[in-house]
Amino acid sequence: SYYKCGSASPDLFGGFNTSLTWKNFDLSAVFGYSIGGKLYNYARLEYDSDGTYTDRNQMKLQDGWSRWEKPGDIATHPAANYGNKSQANIASSRYLEDGDYLKLRSLTLGYNLKLTQWGIQNMRVYLAGENLFTWTKYSGLDPEIPASNGSVMKTAGPGLYPSVRKFMFGLNLTF
């Protein structure tokens, strides 16, 4: 039987930015956030297989996780059994995780120079980065993922990749 155990839609999402200038330097940052919503961690379904798949390495448990060993144990994972036939890794609410995050989407640091002796009013040199850091408790690669293949659950399934981290160098000239 099935039961509703959360929603993939966040309760609140958005972004904010800041720009600072000091002498000839400028710094700007853009953040994005999401609060609420559950993510189905498909990678855990595949790799936290509790011995079901004999052809794959088994995932090391994270701090605070434990395996069932004897009756009465309260554990986050079933017992690991080589060639496990118990289907311990079928779709389960244990693969649902909080989708909250705060992401540093972009950060740019620039320096402005006046080069009027060469006919240049301003030259700005800058370094920029995108998708630099994500603060989250989600154990997967990236909590900001599309729903896979029109699925009703938001999951980092096969064929989905996290946002690419980029680093750039730039030069702006004003004549």
Which residues does each predicted region cover?
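Outer-membrane beta-barrel pore domains and translocons
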Residues: 21, 32-34, 128-132, 174
